Amino acid sequence: MSIRLQEAGLRHGQVQALNNVDLQIGKGERVAIIGPSGAGKSSLLHLMATAVRPSAGQLDLLGEQPWLLTSGARQRLRARVGLVHQAPPLPPRQRVVTAVLAGRLGQWGTLRGLLNLIHPSDVPGAREVLAELGMVDKLFVQCGQLSGGQLQRVGIARALYQQPEVLLTDEPVSAMDPVLADHSLALLNRHAQAHGVTLVASLHAVELALAHFPRIIGIRAGEVAFDCPAEAVTPTMLDALYANEQLGSPVVPTATVLVQIPRC
């Protein structure tokens, strides 16, 4: 089992971002998380990545309980997990080649990591992953000169170069045009299938989620609304998931009730 959440909750100050989440994601599974803005998709991914600690419940990641480990052991565990941000945090003056190679900083010693900032240690490796994303011509360009969609492709290239066992992607194609978005998600899925990588992506574009991922998890108001194979997701389920999103209506807290989460 790659990821297991048991009654997991997460609070941001007074806001309950996630509540009573139970999920199991096996090795090599490819899963899309969908839901309205503010539903908790990013919070769920960051919880899985150990970027934040659950305020309730338990996370098991790659057979470990991260928050029971020493800080050093937790860092080594994180090196086995890739995280692609919606807006990759890349310094504007950093060259693309350095940004991509930084994917393995958690696996390298301190000296090699520092030397890589001065003289990139694996230019062919960076070039190979960038070529798959149509970005090889940007190898030595500074990140500050790239568009939002290009920066997202650099973030994906960085994660692919890292070669993680679990790859978590948070709205990885939101700034790309439809053709590039489709190509990038297809590439991520091919890579995951070829290498047995567990792939989890949060996506706002439902059509991309259904087209590329065998399993779909719907999140609404910080809770799992449904967990089904893509072919079992119905328009009725989607209507309920996204109800009132276009109106920007706040979620009204309701009394806790016991529900059966559909898992098809």
From Swiss-Prot:
Reaction(s) catalysed by this chain's protein: phosphonate(out) + ATP + H2O = phosphonate(in) + ADP + phosphate + H(+)
Statement: the UniProt record of this protein carries the keyword Repeat: no
Membrane topology listed for this record: Peripheral membrane protein
Pfam families: ABC_tran (PF00005)
GO cellular component, one term: plasma membrane
SMART domains given in the database record: AAA (SM00382)
The EC number(s) this enzyme carries: 7.3.2.2
Subcellular location: Cell inner membrane
Job description of the protein: Part of the ABC transporter complex PhnCDE involved in phosphonates import. Responsible for energy coupling to the transport system.
Family: Belongs to the ABC transporter superfamily. Phosphonates importer (TC 3.A.1.9.1) family.
Subunit structure: The complex is composed of two ATP-binding proteins (PhnC), two transmembrane proteins (PhnE) and a solute-binding protein (PhnD).
Protein name: Phosphonates import ATP-binding protein PhnC
Encoding gene, per UniProt annotation: phnC
